[in-house]
Amino acid sequence: MALAAALVLAACQLVDTECDAECRENWLDGGKIDDDCLDTSIVKCLISDSIPTPSAAQKESLHVIIAVHGYSASSYEWGELPAYLATRPEYARIAVSRVVLGGHGRDLDDFRSATWKDWGKPILKEYDTLSAMGYKHISFACMSAGCALLMQYLSDGAFDDRPAPEWVFLIDPLVLPSDKLLSAIVLAGPILGNSPDEGSPDENKHWYVNRPEETLEQLYSLMNLVKNRLEDGFRLPLGTEAMVRKSKHDKSADPAGALLVYKGMRKADNSHVDVKLVDSRLHDFTRLALRTQKLTAADTALQIATFREMADRVLK
């Protein structure tokens, strides 16, 4: 009975978001707008592109953070981190490499056809490229489902034969959804077809409005896999540190997921990683640009404090 009620409610919520041709041309869904980071003639978001032949000094002293966005988002989600670091001379030795997840950043057909394994491929590709170039200090910063992708790699032994990353920063890791309708959506996916999430006109250029049921199935599979890995427990590579920050009032990722991370993802010596809940109502609280919600001074202060904490730890 409860499941039936959930499916009825889901059906009421999941309808295709339609608009005229002019509107769709201004959406990421429509195929006319791509993630800028996919075109190196516009901007070189990957450090492997912007500094393809690092000097000996850069290989030894530059700290590269590979920034990984979340499900249905784009590289824009991490744009404020390098912008902030660029204003602070003390962080001049940090560079941010913003990847675009596989299947993301182009039209809706690419998004619909990609698996979660496809989503994650650019993460390790950039890591391997930077390592081969000789960069010695590489870390990760991930948001939401990007955290789940990285935790899947970590738990699967992907770094057993690779140099260990120095830091793993997880912002609002998506392990348990706050919206318990997700499981019902997956069950009813063939009937319902789509889960639209329309934002402001500017947000729609950087986030998919329509979220096809195929992509929700992939997201659900990824979260279940990572949840199971955390319940079983796994350890980070030797030398890798982790910092996890989770919003207390997140409408997308259940804060209980932070407890799973705390219990299940341990350092190489089996000690706990640094996990803290922060007082925020925002999902992906380090992204403030283009928000439709009214932002407060506390939101800005939390973003800056988190950026500084990440940068200070990387440079230690």
Predicted regions and their residues:
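Catalytic nucleophile-loop/oxyanion-hole region of alpha/beta-hydrolase
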Residues: 106-137
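Short, surface-exposed "cap/lid" segments of acyl-processing enzymes
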Residues: 38-102
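Conserved hydrolase catalytic core segment
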Residues: 152-166
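Active-site nucleophile loop of the alpha/beta-hydrolase fold
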Residues: 169-180
